[in-house]
């Protein structure tokens, strides 16, 4: 047995500290179709060889610890250990490298994003031998994907439920996010839906505060949905935020939403947690509710370039845990992102099969097999003049989520919603006619304004 793959069972127990690379750095390893693969951006402490640090990440996120233990001899370390199988430099960064780690599938509980993250990122990020560590991407094998239900319904089923095809969906987050009474909140919902939006939305921190308890909000929003549907002849929805302090309370709110016969509820999946999110997703599938996901707290995890996790990892985790929509940032507006990178994880949310493409930040080919897709939500700081770019960049399978871009209209909420809908339909029509939205977008919208209701 080579020194890189030796186990304590094979050589006998010897107490003491041992270099990680002797056991966990295996450059000759050929990855298996059933392995979970991870790409870590590693910033080591000075003077530590990359092979040792990459092996340390593999060890501390799988079977290893800081010293040799005699109980290694009671199991097959070769079967269960993580392996650092490849190291590559990061262009333009002298003190960083990418460590590729393969984890055997037996290390993970079936259908549990919680367990997957607890194993891979739960402990190693505090490792003092590393200055910083970032999980850039994961390859989830088909064998593990098939243990997850995934989104409650997916893109096609949602379109069938709403009877809306051939264009992005339109939404608006009600503002001010905090302080409105339930009745005034419901009034704003009604005005936006009547004006032409498909959805309105609770802000992520609207739960059940003293100024507006959740049950009152649900009732007034349901009334707004019924009234706007009757007037427009279209199916409407409001993302009723079911996030709560306990899973039991969250489920109680989801049950009440179902009793009101509304089409969709919402969850803050990072602050609420993956276990709660998966439970809610299962309930939504069983009871015909769509599930909108907000990513509140994501920047705490993904903003730093050398530490934490990239959002593409959180997006993959959400597709496994379950959600029909998720906020995915945008490449215009006040939270502008890198276009190719953003579209890379948008494709990871929507498509069945995504090829490796490092220019878009995709480190591994990902096959989702039959797992339904998730609609990306473009939001934050967008307005009608962004519509040509949004239509061209995100395509039909997306939700364009306005806020001030609807409610800030000088004539009020309903005219703001009308402006959103007119601009969208004008851009979609022009695109379908073969016109260049990038060059003619402003003219297209100005022309549509002359004939708007």
UniProtKB/Swiss-Prot annotation:
| N-acetylproline modification, residue list | 3
Protein origin, superkingdom: Eukaryota
Post-translational modifications: The disulfide bond which can form in the large chain dimeric partners within the hexadecamer appears to be associated with oxidative stress and protein turnover.
The UniProt record gives the binding positions of Mg(2+) as 201, 203-204
Any one GO molecular-function label of the UniProt entry: magnesium ion binding
Which Pfam families does this chain map to?
A: RuBisCO_large, RuBisCO_large_N
Q: What is this protein called?
A: Ribulose bisphosphate carboxylase large chain
List the source organism.
Galium scabrum
The record lists the lineage as: Eukaryota, Viridiplantae, Streptophyta, Embryophyta, Tracheophyta
